[in-house]
Amino acid sequence: MEARTTDLSDLYPEGEALPMVFKSFGGRARFAGRVRTLRVFEDNALVRKVLEEEGAGQVLFVDGGGSLRTALLGGNLARLAWERGWAGVVVHGAVRDTEELRGVPIGLLALAATPKKSAKEGKGEVDVPLKVLGVEVLPGSFLLADEDGLLLLPEPPSGVRSGG
């Protein structure tokens, strides 16, 4: 990803912006890709199930309700995401294994880290519209992330490709 979210936001005013309240935990601070969505609460079984699919440069956006009590992604799932070709994962919630996450060469954003693991019951919804920080996150939209924030567009901007 070469273009900056600030420049693209100016060029595409129809884009939705999420402020950088997220912390970067992965090996890449800048990444972009088509969005897959997931809504869960303190249960990461569906996170694993989706990340086991071929990522093809997509970004998984996980709405964990902003809960910081349990981690929805750790080192094992981050490595799985990288091995399956995901460009990144955004977690509106917490992660763990932060030292391991830094070594995985994809974008990994979350609100915070916590040592506590999540439930594994498989509760949640896949590929549904999300509302995070007042912004609608739609499956199939295009997400660009860098140090200035996250930008959601209906289609990829000219010259921007998925990946890091």
UniProtKB/Swiss-Prot annotation:
Keywords: Lyase, Metal-binding
The keyword Nucleotide-binding is assigned to this record: no
Keyword Metal-binding attached: yes
Family annotation (SUPFAM superfamilies): RraA-like
GO molecular function: 4-hydroxy-4-methyl-2-oxoglutarate aldolase activity; metal ion binding; oxaloacetate decarboxylase activity; ribonuclease inhibitor activity
UniProt-annotated binding residues for a divalent metal cation: 97
InterPro entries, A to Z: RraA, RraA/RraA-like, RraA/RraA-like_sf
Enzyme Commission numbers on file: 4.1.3.17, 4.1.1.112
Names of required cofactors: a divalent metal cation
Class in the EC hierarchy, top level: lyase
GO biological process, one term: regulation of RNA metabolic process
Entry binding sites for substrate: 74-77, 96
Reactions catalysed: 4-hydroxy-4-methyl-2-oxoglutarate = 2 pyruvate; oxaloacetate + H(+) = pyruvate + CO2
Family from the record: Belongs to the class II aldolase/RraA-like family.
PANTHER family documented for this protein: 4-HYDROXY-4-METHYL-2-OXOGLUTARATE ALDOLASE 3-RELATED
Complexes and interactors: Homotrimer.
Role this protein plays: Catalyzes the aldol cleavage of 4-hydroxy-4-methyl-2-oxoglutarate (HMG) into 2 molecules of pyruvate. Also contains a secondary oxaloacetate (OAA) decarboxylase activity due to the common pyruvate enolate transition state formed following C-C bond cleavage in the retro-aldol and decarboxylation reactions.
Official protein name in the record: Putative 4-hydroxy-4-methyl-2-oxoglutarate aldolase
Organism of this sequence: Thermus thermophilus (strain ATCC BAA-163 / DSM 7039 / HB27)
